[in-house]
């Protein structure tokens, strides 16, 4: 109930999680491989002196997991030693589990939050978004270098909001300053696996594909039919985004009434 812990920040949450694990005598600490989980869990693992497996896609044993490696081109098996296992789970890698009996919830007291954590909470409160987290969204619409400038992402934002999804971007678009870096999808950005991924004006560089090729359905829109993105797309449209996106927005609006 502490307001200072309302925002999921590593500086405030990691020490509290590590302390709770110690007091409970827990053998595992699990979380999602979202930007929040990837920020908090490694710090908690360090405070616990525990090993960690990130972005796991399968559980082999209590301390053994599978996770993607080499830009998603290989699957490696990792084993964590020690008495505590910390792991972040790729959300879309596991199907929903069958309902079971409700577990007991234990309420624990938390320690004091330092001044730095309190300041970061105040900053975080001004940066909330109405869209779902990029790593958890069922629909992701991403734009690439072909969008040319940041203001052109407005049309992608409109489509994104109509579909109830999250906005993403290629590294080229993020590096060019068109969008904030936290929207970057790829090997050095966010790894996503939504039900629907729409790639607009994205060439399909290997580092970008590593971050989205786990998507269930991939739609590519690009004016160049030779771009690599079409090799992984389930559906492709060869056209300019200036023509394709407004037309797609109009059709979605019709369907939504």
Please name every model-derived segment.
Residues 1-257:
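N-terminal glycine-rich FAD/FM-binding segment characteristic of electron-transfer flavoproteins
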